[in-house]
Structures are given as C-alpha cells and as structure tokens.
Amino acid sequence: MATTLEEFSAKLDRLDAEFAKKMEEQNKKFFADKPDESTLSPEMKEHYEKFEKMIQEHTDKFNKKMHEHSEHFKAKFAELLEQQKNAQFPGK
C-alpha cells in the first residue's frame, strides 16, 4: 500500500511532537534536581540561571532544527510522489 503525503506528514509531525515532549520532560527532571535556591550563593544562583537558560535555548534550537528537517523531508516526499505520478502517467 502506498503512503500518501498526508500520512507521511502526519507521521513526521507526530514524531516531532513526541520528541519535543520527551526533551521537555528531560529538562523538567534535570531542573527539578537543582538545590533549593535559599542554600545557593548569589554566584551559584546566577550560574544555575544561566545554565537553565542555555539548556532551554539549545532545546528550542534543536526542536526548531528537527522541524526544519521534517519540512524538508515532506517537500522531498511530495517531489518523489510527483515524479512517480509523472512516470506512471506521462503527459497528465
């Protein structure tokens, strides 16, 4: 059975969403392990804040890149389907 563009796109979208959710869950677990802020020196508190911000920025960049790759794969798949259609039904 042939896969349609809609099926392929839906699967990539679902995988992107699942991966983003897993990344967010991992970040939450990681951030939950942070010591109580009242026990941290101002320097360590600043360090943790910078580190958390950096992790979130990298997560966001990674998720954006994953989405860009998915969009590229969708376009390539659509192109392949069009080529296949043209090969099967020339002149249509």
UniProtKB/Swiss-Prot annotation:
Cellular component aspect of the GO annotation: cytoplasm; microtubule; microtubule cytoskeleton
SUPFAM superfamilies: C-terminal domain of PLC-beta (SSF69989)
A GO BP annotation: cilium-dependent cell motility
Keywords, in A-Z order: Cytoplasm, Cytoskeleton, Microtubule
InterPro entries: KMP11 (IPR004132)
Compartments, as annotated in UniProt: Cytoplasm, Cytoskeleton
Residues spanning the membrane: none
One Pfam family hit: KMP11
Subunit structure: Monomer.
Functional summary from the UniProt entry: May be involved in the regulation of the cytoskeleton through interaction with the subpellicular microtubules. May be involved in parasite mobility and attachment to the surface of the host cell. Behaves as a strong immunogen during infection.
Family: Belongs to the KMP-11 family.
Extra remark beyond the main annotation: There are four copies of the KMP-11 gene in T.cruzi.
Protein name: Kinetoplastid membrane protein 11
Organismal lineage: Eukaryota, Discoba, Euglenozoa, Kinetoplastea, Metakinetoplastina
